[in-house]
From Swiss-Prot:
Keywords: ATP-binding, Cell membrane, Magnesium, Membrane, Metal-binding, Nucleotide-binding, Phosphoprotein, Translocase, Transmembrane, Transmembrane helix. Its EC number is 7.2.2.-. InterPro entries: ATPase_P-typ_cation-transptr_C, ATPase_P-typ_cation-transptr_N, ATPase_P-typ_cyto_dom_N, ATPase_P-typ_P_site, ATPase_P-typ_TM_dom_sf, ATPase_P-typ_transduc_dom_A_sf, HAD-like_sf, HAD_sf. PROSITE patterns: ATPASE_E1_E2. This is Probable cation-transporting P-type ATPase. It is found in: Cell membrane.
């Protein structure tokens, strides 16, 4: 080591100035306040904030002009803007809190990197933080070290590195001063890459790239420049929200001007606030205020469930996208398999005993396995030691006197051990190399067995030995003759076996119309064998090597072996461009571009590197494919729940808009004489009433729907998130909205007629309107609350078991209870503009509940008719 002369202090400074520091910026946590502010980018939220400001202006000006300081109307006017504002803030808090929690969960899973490395500088070999390494530095490496930067090998003493995080190759790579590999950058054996681990030997290399200029750094830059993904539902809701907002804004202007004209432009100062409140009420009716809030609540509850199931969702919307996945491009090692080599079979030749084979494998082995399970060394050698029962082998009687390390050219490892006056040569390696070195052996006897195991994806190691009575390690001729005239002992077969639950998870994918695709850096035979065993592959013609891949035929294959990161990206893009929703699993730096490009990137939490975790949308903390499938099922449930809640939201928005419009211009004209005599400016529903309907009516059922277990077998049938209201959904929304608006107006009118004819109520236009509003308020809100039960099942409610939907029943009845509090408790009735002392008017109570029962009855009749025609 003393022959290496390192950089001087001046050269270090010059190199750092020219090439930069050896640092890769980690993705910082987005501050909570910034996440909170980002929630306000929605046009719906902006419009609601404008409505808040306008309502506040009206409250202040009206209060000052009318001297309402001690009037109950001041409370009513001030309630409206703050209810709208609380709605906006609640939504923003829910979304930002959950995303911040998910960020922190993902951040805690990041792995710790080696902080120091050994560098030759002008003062000799020193230990320095990896961040101080510069281009031109000479680095010393030995087993266990993490390579701190990219570089070129200067000296290699049986140097072997694990580069699976970058290349996908599951076995260590032999490194040498001269390239003995391919021409591709990652195939060159004389190059080292930042983040790789030295698993055997030692070496020296010169740093050629640091920080963002390393191979890892280049991938980081690709990941950081990626755009934020929107889920299919988010994309639809963004369009729907804009449509509702612009439509509402247009109607706001029209209704304000028309109503002002009807009231009289000549008295603008007295009438503008009345017209403005009516227009704001219309905007509040049109905009489904709970649109974002309830979706975030449903997403958050689903995310919590999945966190308990070992899946950490970094972004709320990813849960819904996961439910719509049609293609899963999954890695093999560690995801479908256990990421742990195991001996699955062995063969003892002739008179060899299992003890003989075991002893030879222990002696020709450089790995260590402690009693507590900790291990170091080559994964294959570790697997051999874990398989063997070393008790009784008397290994302490043998002393190793010589080793000829494994290298990729010879494909052999040899050791000489001494016991008493005998020297025993033990050789292990590939069958095709070792069998010809054995004496008295017809390799054709062994070859069929080995070929069969190889075709099943097993890695086979042959073992041979011979006994010498003298051995001189300094004698070159003796050393060269070691690997000859061997006695064949037998062989062992190893495999990274599939996880127990993987096969069932793959079967669940097929049943759910999801296509699993294996993309691996491993060998084709190994990948094919595992894929066939798990059910991914039925025809071997659907498996292909990366070098043979034709981009135009990507969708014909189900297994891709020995692929490059660029090819993995091409595979993902091919399926996406064909219109499929694609999930990708990965754990290495090489997987990061595909994780970003996919619709849902799933990174393994245990084996995943930080860059892959940053790129992913979901972190699978138990590295299990079955967890991804569980996530898809939860995602489907989430989408179904969102669809049901959105149906109810749109139902009340459409019905409420129709009621407010027709109420202002039809009921206002019909009852003009009675209202004008009573000196009252007519208004159908206040903004506060509509907000109560849009929030509390849907709030409890929305949470209940999210918690309620879904009875449908969602993973046993095709599923799509492409259409929000498919299978009659759009038609049902239209006719139910028309029905609900008709019934609301009908019972609103009946309530007003009753009040007009009542000796006490008929004296006040305000009381006449409150009587109608009480009935209409209950019909619109109560019907929407109970409609959540209708949405749970296609069959009539009378034909279902209430126990199966107990949580939704509780949610619906909780909403009804809120309405009862408002209409029966006088102070609340005052604030929300309903009639006080309703118990004195049982007819109005009958109207209120009669309209709800009529709506539900008509829905039940429609279901019965559909059931009789077999269209449910």
């Amino acid at each position: 080591m003393n022959k290496w002369t390192g950089l001087s202090a001046a050269a270090v400074l010059e190199s750092r100035a020219q090439h930069g520091a050896n640092l890769i910026p980690t993705k910082k946590l987005t501050p909570f306040w910034l996440l909170f502010l980002e929630q306000f980018k929605s046009l719906v939220v902006i419009l609601l904030l404008v409505a808040t400001i306008l309502s506040l202006v009206v409250a202040i000006i009206s209060g000052v002009n009318a001297n309402w300081l001690f009037d109950h109307n001041l409370v009513i006017e001030w309630t409206q803007p703050f209810v709208i504002l609380i709605t906006v803030l609640a939504n923003s808090l829910i979304g930002s809190i959950q995303e911040f929690k998910a960020q922190k969960s993902a951040h805690t899973l990041k792995s710790l990197t080696q902080p120091f490395t050994r560098v030759f500088r002008e003062e000799g070999l020193v230990s320095l933080p990896v961040g101080e390494v510069v281009v031109g530095d000479i680095i010393f490496l030995e087993a266990g070290d993490i390579i701190p930067a990219d570089g070129k090998v200067l000296q290699a003493n049986h140097l072997r590195c694990m580069e699976s995080f970058l290349t996908g190759e599951s076995v260590p790579v032999d490194k040498s001063v001269v390239n003995t590999g391919g021409k591709g950058l990652l195939e060159q054996t004389n190059l080292l890459f930042s983040g790789a681990q030295v698993v055997f030997g030692s070496g020296v290399f010169e740093v050629t790239a640091v920080g963002l200029n390393t191979q890892v750094g280049q991938i980081v830059k690709t990941v950081d420049s990626s755009a934020t993904k929107l889920s299919p539902l988010q994309q639809k809701l963004e369009k729907v929200g804009k449509w509702f907002s612009w439509f509402g804004l247009g109607l706001f202007v029209v209704v304000f001007l028309v109503q002002l004209g009807l009231l009289g432009f000549h008295n603008f100062s007295a009438n503008w606030s009345i017209a403005l409140i009516g227009a704001i009420a219309l905007v509040v009716a049109i905009i489904p205020e709970g649109l974002v809030t309830f979706i975030n609540v449903i997403f958050a509850l689903s995310v919590q469930k999945l966190t308990k199931q070992k899946a950490i969702i970094k972004y709320l919307a990813a849960i819904e996208t996961l439910g719509g996945v049609q293609i899963i491009c999954t890695d093999k090692t560690g995801t479908l398999t256990q990421n742990k080599m195991k001996v699955v079979d062995y063969f003892c030749f002739s008179n060899t005993t299992q003890t003989d084979l075991a002893r030879a494998l222990c002696l020709c082995n450089n790995a260590t396995v402690n009693t507590n399970g900790d291990s170091t060394g080559d994964p294959t050698e570790i697997a051999l030691l874990q398989w063997l029962d070393r008790d009784g082998l008397e290994l302490n009687h043998y002393t190793r006197v010589y080793e000829k390390a494994f290298d990729s050219n010879r494909k052999l490892m040899s050791v000489v051990v001494q016991k008493d006056n005998r020297f025993i040569v033990i050789v292990k390696g590939a069958h095709d190399v070792l069998l010809p070195l054995c004496k008295g052996l017809d390799s054709n006897q062994i070859k069929p067995l080995i070929d069969e195991r190889a075709s099943n994806g097993l890695r086979n190691l042959a073992v041979g030995l011979k006994v010498l009575y003298c051995f001189d390690p300094e004698n070159t001729q003796t050393v060269n003759e070691l690997e000859s005239e061997l006695d064949f002992l037998g062989s062992v077969s190893l495999q990274d076996p599939p996880r127990i639950e993987s096969k069932a998870a793959i079967m669940a994918c097929h049943q759910a119309n999801i296509t699993p695709i294996m993309i691996t850096g491993d060998h084709l035979k190994t990948a094919t064998a595992i894929a066939k065993e798990l059910g991914i592959l039925t025809d071997e013609r659907q498996a292909i090597l990366g070098v043979d891949l034709d981009p135009a035929k990507i969708m014909e294959y189900r297994v891709f072996a020995r692929v490059t990161p660029q090819q993995k990206l091409e595979i993902v893009n091919a399926w996406k461009q064909a219109g499929y929703t694609v999930a990708v699993t990965g754990d290495g730096v090489n997987d990061a571009p595909a994780l970003v490009t996919s619709d849902v990137g799933c990174c393994m939490g245990q084996t995943g590197v930080d860059i892959a975790k940053d790129a992913a949308d979901v972190i699978i903390s138990d590295d299990n494919f079955a967890t991804i499938v569980n996530g898809i099922e939860q995602g489907r449930k989430t989408f179904l729940t969102c669809k049901r809640v959105l149906f109810n939201l749109f139902l009340t928005s459409i019905a409420g808009t129709i009621v407010v419009l027709l109420g202002l211009f039809v009921l206002g004209e019909v009852f003009r004489e009675q209202l004008s005599k009573a000196n009252h400016n007519f208004q159908v529903f206040t903004p506060t009433q509509l907000l109560i309907i849009n929030l509390f009516v849907h709030g409890f059922p929305a949470v209940a729907l999210a918690i309620q277990p879904v009875q449908e077998k969602l993973m046993l049938k095709p599923f799509s998130t492409k259409n929000l209201f498919y299978n009659r959904g759009g038609f049902d929304l239209i006719w139910q909205s028309l029905l609900l608006s008709f019934l609301t107006l009908l019972f609103y009118s009946l309530g007003m007629v009753y009040a007009i004819n009542d000796p006490e109520l008929g004296k006040s236009g305000d009381l006449i309107n409150r009587a109608g509003a009480t009935c209409g308020f209950m019909v619109l809100g109560g019907s929407a609350a109970l409609n959540s039960l209708n949405l749970m099942v296609d069959r009539p409610l009378v034909a279902t078991n209430p126990k199966h939907y107990g949580i939704v029943w509780l949610g619906a009845l909780s909403s009804i209870f809120v309405f009862l509090l408002i209409i029966f408790i006088n102070p609340l009735g005052l604030v929300f503009s309903t009639l006080k002392d309703l118990t004195a008017h049982p007819v109005l109570i009958g109207y209120s509940f009669g309209g709800v029962l009529l709506y539900m009855t008509i829905n039940e009749v429609v279901k019965l008719i559909r059931l009789s025609y077999g269209s449910v």
